[in-house]
């Protein structure tokens, strides 16, 4: 599972997800990319499920780039624990994804197989996504 090796602070505040993605909005490495259209927290398990789905479709051909990394700790208190007494323990890690962010890239295979793999990976995510080519002319997102 993806997670940071070490962090400066164990716990973070939740924060807001306003606006569009500042960086990582263009396909740089591969020929096709999967672009997020909604803001959401993507968990490490969801990223891994997408990676496995893509690899199964590609059957060891081509190359995959994962453009998001879960670096935000998510905490929760145990069931039946009363309020107060400090923040809960770290339960997992998420990547903060804003609209326009490229999540995955695929290269080195034909276009039909790349689109099929990314469409299958998109079913594993809780957000709306769009398959984009390397060079997309026009369009805000």
Curated annotation (Swiss-Prot):
Molecular function via GO: rRNA binding; structural constituent of ribosome; tRNA binding
PROSITE patterns: RIBOSOMAL_L16_1 (PS00586), RIBOSOMAL_L16_2 (PS00701)
Any single Pfam family the record assigns to this protein: Ribosomal_L16
GO cellular component term of the entry, any: cytosolic large ribosomal subunit
GO terms for biological process, alphabetical: translation
Keywords tagged on the record: Ribonucleoprotein, Ribosomal protein, RNA-binding, rRNA-binding, tRNA-binding
Alphabetical list of InterPro entries matching this protein: Ribosomal_uL16 (IPR047873), Ribosomal_uL16_bact-type (IPR000114), Ribosomal_uL16_CS (IPR020798), Ribosomal_uL16_dom (IPR016180), Ribosomal_uL16_sf (IPR036920)
Family: Belongs to the universal ribosomal protein uL16 family.
HAMAP family linked to this entry: Ribosomal_uL16
Subunit structure: Part of the 50S ribosomal subunit.
Its job: Binds 23S rRNA and is also seen to make contacts with the A and possibly P site tRNAs.
UniProt-recorded name of the protein: Large ribosomal subunit protein uL16
Source species: Kosmotoga olearia (strain ATCC BAA-1733 / DSM 21960 / TBF 19.5.1)
Lineage of the organism: Bacteria, Thermotogati, Thermotogota, Thermotogae, Kosmotogales
